[in-house]
Amino acid sequence: MLATLAAAMLVTVAPQRQTDTTIAVPAGASLSVNNFGGGITVHGWSENRVKVHAETGRRGRVEVSLVGNTVVVKASSREGAPSVMDFDITVPQSMGVSLSGTYADITVDGVQGPINAETVNGEVNVRGGKGIITLHSIQGSVTLADASGRIEVNSVNEDIALTNVSGEIKVETTNGGIMMTGIQSSSVDAGTINGDVLYEGTVTDGGSYSFASHNGDISVSIPDRANVTVATATANGEIDASFTLPLTSTTGKHRKTFKIGSASARMELESFQGDIKLRRPQELRDRIDRKHKHDQNENENDSDSDSSWHFDLGSVTAYATRYAAAYAPKYAAQYAAQYAPRYARQYARAYSRTYADTYKWQRSRKH
């Protein structure tokens, strides 16, 4: 979707040109792709070759090279201006990949190596991956499924969803919800400012779990035989459990601590404006199923309207520049004083630096 929008913003309609390049790679090789606008799709296969299929306009140019042990793929234009290009790349399954774009959607499927994927305006959707996995988008949702390792996922203005993921997990977004299902981990840290947080997964003995939201509810599953200390805090919400919990301490109405079993794990739940809900795993799974059905119906209703939505790059640039200048310092200061310093740093970093660098570059290209 965003790849199509980027194309509409940056270029006029032009004939598409297709190129195919195949490179044999040694064991342990990696892939690096940079694409300003368009799409990046990466698949895994059993061969020791990298195949790059690209679709671009007549001015676009694809550069594929082997630099040391890294296959480097770049999109460029004969006139030097940013180009819009769609990449479909097939790599050995164990290959590590590093993918970046500005107006680019990123999709990875069937790769079982380390993954780094970053975009400014676009979605990031990954299935698979092992080792260090880092996913980031400013204006786009991020999904990760069937992955394991040390995982860090960030978004600013969209939702994050993790499914069947294991390992050390850190998730942050600013204006979006966080949904984690089928998680197997002894270390989870997830937080958002404007959105709900949902966690359905293991609570491992000796593990550490932290979930926070400023303006949203937190829903967490507690397995029947969990051994965990649950510390909850909310300023303007309720603390609600669907089963009996042994209350060990309370500070006022909105701060309570519960100890379950041997209490060897530690779980901290904090929401400023939302409720904290403790549920059994099956209750959350049923809720998730209902949400998926609801979202599917909404997507079907919205599919026709998406194709008629257009905007121009100049308007977006002007709006984002004003937004970064007017709101980022204000919100950063507000949350630093009122809620959590880590969110203030996240918000200021994401808006002030990323947008400033991106749009400063765009303005410099015009002059």
Predicted features, each with a name:
Residues M1-H367:
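Intrinsically disordered, low-complexity terminal regions
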